[in-house]
Amino acid sequence: MIELLLFGIILGLISCVLAGLFVSAYYQYKRNR
């Protein structure tokens, strides 16, 4: 049960980091145009 919880937390963190990177890259792209 603990492993499943840890897996969910790690998955959430990775998705949050990816979303942050995507948004920052998108803003940089819009600003540079």
Curated annotation (Swiss-Prot):
Kindly list the GO molecular function terms attached to this UniProt entry: electron transporter, transferring electrons within cytochrome b6/f complex of photosystem II activity
Q: Matching InterPro entries, A to Z? A: Cyt_6/f_cplx_su5, Cyt_6/f_cplx_su5_sf
**What are the boundaries of the signal sequence?**
none
The primary location reported for this protein is: plastid
How does it sit in the bilayer?
Single-pass membrane protein
Query: GO biological process: any one?
Result: photosynthesis
Superkingdom of the source?
Eukaryota
Pfam families from the xrefs? PetG
Which compartments does it reside in? Answer: Plastid, Chloroplast thylakoid membrane
Entry GO CC:
chloroplast thylakoid membrane; cytochrome b6f complex
Q: Which residues form a coiled coil?
A: none
Question: Which terms are listed as keywords in the entry?
Answer: Chloroplast, Electron transport, Membrane, Photosynthesis, Plastid, Thylakoid, Transmembrane, Transmembrane helix, Transport
The record lists the membrane-crossing segments as 5-25
Family membership, please give it. Answer: Belongs to the PetG family.
Biological role stated in the UniProt entry: Component of the cytochrome b6-f complex, which mediates electron transfer between photosystem II (PSII) and photosystem I (PSI), cyclic electron flow around PSI, and state transitions. PetG is required for either the stability or assembly of the cytochrome b6-f complex.
Q: How does it assemble?
A: The 4 large subunits of the cytochrome b6-f complex are cytochrome b6, subunit IV (17 kDa polypeptide, PetD), cytochrome f and the Rieske protein, while the 4 small subunits are PetG, PetL, PetM and PetN. The complex functions as a dimer.
Indicate what this protein is called per its UniProt record.
Cytochrome b6-f complex subunit 5
| The organism of origin for this protein | Bigelowiella natans (Pedinomonas minutissima)
The gene coding this protein: petG
